[in-house]
Design a protein with these regions (language model features):
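N-terminal structural segment of carbohydrate-active enzymes
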Residues: 1-131, 139-156
Length: 156
């Protein structure tokens, strides 16, 4: 049964993309994304968004989207490795932000195209009549914060 958004009130659906589209139920302690699986931006498709909208939701709060410290090796894409001694698990904590100008490469089907995939998700969400909310907590940073995608002239 849909929730009624009466008198213009927002109804927010919090969504963690790394879990949303993941159909792997292994849940191995300290497991890799290959062992435990990971959801992708593209898993949040028009069918899913339409179903969420039909529940009466007005906004989707995408959590864990900004690039955070993790232990997957993305150095071939210019993303530096994180120190295993300070990362929470292999997948990391979405609140240990490592680059406020980038998105989590685990959530992309193509790491070099991760920002475009995220932008397509935002467009898809809006096309389905929903608004987007993104977590942004400036003091929740990884111990090794260093942007590899910041705009020219911006200092870390």
């Amino acid at each position: 049964m849909p929730i009624e958004a009466s008198s213009g009130k927002m109804i927010i659906y919090q969504l963690l993309p790394r879990l949303f589209g993941n159909r792997n139920t292994t849940n191995k302690f300290y497991g890799t994304k290959e062992e435990n699986g990971v959801g992708k931006f593209n898993d949040i498709n028009d069918v899913a968004l339409s179903a969420i909208k039909k529940m009466g939701v007005t906004h989707i709060w995408y959590t864990g989207v900004i690039e955070h410290a993790l232990l997957t090796d993305y150095t071939k894409f210019g993303i530096p490795m994180d120190d295993a001694d300070v990362v929470k698990g292999i997948a990391g904590s979405p609140y240990a932000i490592k680059d406020y100008y980038d998105v989590n490469p685990d959530l992309a089907t193509s790491v070099p195209d991760r920002m475009q995939e995220f932008e397509q998700l935002v467009t898809r969400t809006k096309s389905n009549g929903l608004k987007v909310i993104i977590d942004f907590v400036p003091n929740h940073v990884a111990r090794a914060y260093k942007s590899d995608t910041k705009p020219e002239g911006i200092k870390d």
